[in-house]
């Protein structure tokens, strides 16, 4: 998993509340267990028309936001089913941070496991970030995880809270396997001791 320290990039405003995981990645994309290639399915029912052509009105199809790294979203983002494909699709598209006032619990946890930073902010801060994001190509936000700050294009700042353990994992690029490998020496020592003490086993 890639480390998350400081992220600077265009923020796309998605002013929709209660975006569920079915909307983030529709069911037809759930047949794969690969984490790559799902970016094409991200919000596919909103990004594409019935004939397969792009919907020019959807935010991520607008030229200024095609390479967005941050998504500023309405309340209760990622609610609904537990599909881990939702953060996979966001990550494959290039989004590494989602900012909202609240998230679906399972989606929130899955983001951390996949290297995405979900940030909870107040409604006042979200409204300001929506204003910043609507600047289009100038809608660059800086996400400073170490200092737990969001910096806007005009120099404004918003702070956020994060669990220290999850912060440690993101800063060091540690997924579940990485966390286990951090304890490799202790695991090896335990196994060596167990073999010596229970040679008969």
Swiss-Prot record:
Pathway(s) of this molecule: Amino-acid biosynthesis; L-leucine biosynthesis; L-leucine from 3-methyl-2-oxobutanoate: step 2/4
UniProt enzyme class: lyase
EC number: 4.2.1.33
Regions annotated as coiled coil: none
Matches recorded under HAMAP family: LeuD_type1
Role this protein plays: Catalyzes the isomerization between 2-isopropylmalate and 3-isopropylmalate, via the formation of 2-isopropylmaleate.
Assembly description: Heterodimer of LeuC and LeuD.
Protein name: 3-isopropylmalate dehydratase small subunit
Annotated organism of origin: Nitrobacter hamburgensis (strain DSM 10229 / NCIMB 13809 / X14)
Upper lineage: Bacteria, Pseudomonadati, Pseudomonadota, Alphaproteobacteria, Hyphomicrobiales
Gene name of the record: leuD
